Amino acid sequence: MHLLKGGVVLIITLILFLITSSIVAIREDPSLIGVDRQIPTGPDPLHNPPQPSPKHHHWIGVEENNIDRSWNYVDYESHHAHSPIHNSPEPAPLYRHLIGV
């Protein structure tokens, strides 16, 4: 009985040793299991994204300045400058007869 328990412990120990040593070897050289990893050279695109051209940046700025705001737009820099309840827009002339203006 003691011999059987010793054999089981020995087999489990050998299996754990083989697994851990193979994991260490694969981490050092992934090509052992057929993984050919190529490390890119040059600037890292995740941490150093290319900057937009000045022409493109200017076009975006012009587009942002010409945005038509909706009647319920809130300017978050000045909280009380625009109140959609008190400053509601006038109805279009086409629909004035529907509301009695």
UniProtKB/Swiss-Prot annotation:
Residues bearing attached sugar chains per UniProt: P43
Region (Disordered): 37-58
Family: Belongs to the CLV3/ESR signal peptide family.
Modified residue annotations for Sulfotyrosine: Y76
Record-level Gene Ontology MF annotations: receptor serine/threonine kinase binding
GO BP: any one term: phloem development
Organism, scientific name: Arabidopsis thaliana (Mouse-ear cress)
Name of the protein described by the UniProt record: CLAVATA3/ESR (CLE)-related protein 18
Signal sequence region: 1-25
Modified residues (Hydroxyproline): P40, P43, P84
Listed GO CC annotations: apoplast
